[in-house]
From Swiss-Prot:
SUPFAM superfamilies: Ribosomal protein L4. GO terms for molecular function: structural constituent of ribosome. InterPro entries: Ribos_uL4_C_dom, Ribosomal_uL4, Ribosomal_uL4_dom_sf, Ribosomal_uL4_euk/arc_CS, Ribosomal_uL4_euk/arch. This is Large ribosomal subunit protein uL4. It comes from the Eukaryota. It comes from Trypanosoma brucei brucei. Keywords: Ribonucleoprotein, Ribosomal protein. It holds the Pfam family Ribosomal_L4. GO terms for biological process: translation. GO terms for cellular component: ribonucleoprotein complex; ribosome.
Length: 374
């Protein structure tokens, strides 16, 4: 969350700061991606147009089932003879020329109701996310040449009447890179939508927010730049696709109206009845520091020192039954057991016997030599 007390106001014609304004409290609100995604999904459903197939599609045949006993399916079959269609299955979704399975109806539940407070919370979260450069860049916006986020400009941009002046303004504040990104991303849509007046798709660029609907004439024909009124901010524009972090350019007068529209953490909004900014549950996420602070330790009771209980483990005393005690009393027993195990192996026994025979032969030979010398 943003923690700056003030934001710089930039000139519309020159690359310089012309003033400052306090940061609205809405930019320090908690960011809830799950709430934004949920509200966006349900809001997007409210602009759908009902559609359905013809009620009689696939049912315009004179048919009758042949019944059982003919070793064929019991699907209704077309009457008549003398044509390739006679006797062909009809009506079913598995048949040629038949209806679809579960034909679509126009009385489907197309629209969704959303809690008013939930919609306001989602808008607040989207605005708070737009003040973090990391989230704005992760959404794909080109803001490397932008001086500051959130970007606030003077109200002189509302006096522009020519698109040429608007393009010069975008170059001055460094937002032209994001507009060019939108132009470069324009391509033909994949699928049937290209035949239904939705031929092209493109990314979303910056959004210019103004205090009212005046002064939009110079900007409305720039492809890649969206315009919005601060009094009617829409979540579908603040977080396209349900992804927070839209690059927003604010005019100074629109930026200063945010505290009145959304209120603060202590004062309710003067526009939205009964709405106050949702306060974060934790101002510090360092739980260890909180638990070790003097304020918390002063309230908690001192730690009780429990007497040390004797261990339930009893030292073994029977060396015959306990192997560990037996090895501790007689360490040679482990080697002795390994030697006994080696004696049980037939190959080892034969090898030792052969070695013993060789040793005895050498000993007899040495004894014979000693007797000859005498």
């Amino acid at each position: 969350m943003t923690a700056r007390p003030s934001v710089s106001v930039y000139s519309a014609s020159e690359d310089k700061v012309v003033g400052t304004c306090s940061l609205p409290a809405v930019f320090t609100a908690p960011i809830r991606h799950d709430v934004v995604q949920f509200v966006h999904t349900n809001m997007a459903k409210n602009s759908r147009q009902p559609y359905a197939v013809n009620r009689l599609s696939g049912m315009k045949h004179s048919t009758e089932s042949w019944g059982t006993g003919r070793a064929v399916a019991r699907i209704p079959r077309i009457h008549g003879g003398g044509t390739s269609m006679s006797g062909a299955g009809a009506f079913g979704n598995m048949c040629r020329g038949g209806r679809m399975f579960a034909p679509t109806k126009i009385f489907r539940r197309w629209h969704r109701k959303i809690n008013l407070h939930q919609k306001r919370f989602a808008v607040v979260s989207a605005l708070a996310a737009s003040s973090l450069p990391a989230l704005v860049m992760s959404r794909g916006h080109k803001i490397e040449n932008v001086a500051e986020v959130p970007l606030v400009v003077e109200d002189g941009v509302r006096a522009y009447e020519k698109t040429k002046e608007a393009m010069t303004f975008l170059k001055t504040v460094g937002a032209i890179d994001d507009v060019n990104r939108v132009n470069d991303s324009r391509q033909i849509r994949a699928g049937r939508g290209k035949m239904r007046n939705r031929r092209y798709v493109a990314r979303r660029g910056p959004m210019l927010v103004m205090p009212d609907n005046k002064g939009t004439r110079a900007f409305r024909n720039i492809f890649g730049l969206d315009l919005a009124n601060v009094n009617s901010l829409n979540l579908l524009h603040l977080a396209p696709g349900g992804h927070v972090g839209r690059f927003i350019i604010w005019t100074k007068s629109a930026f200063e109206k945010l505290d009145k529209i959304f209120g603060t953490f202590t004062e309710p909004s003067t526009v939205k009845s009964g709405f106050m900014l949702p306060a974060p549950m934790l101002t510090s996420t360092d739980v260890t520091r909180i638990m070790q602070s003097e304020e918390v330790r002063r309230v908690l009771k001192p730690k009780k020192l429990q007497p040390k209980r004797p261990s339930r483990y009893r030292q073994p005393t029977n060396g015959i039954r306990n192997r560990r005690l037996r090895l501790r009393l007689n360490p040679f027993q482990k080697k002795e057991k390994a030697m006994a195990k080696g004696m049980q192996n037939k190959k080892n026994r034969e090898a030792r016997h052969a070695a013993k025979v060789v040793r005895l032969a050498k000993a007899r030979k040495n004894v014979a030599k000693a007797l000859k010398k005498k």
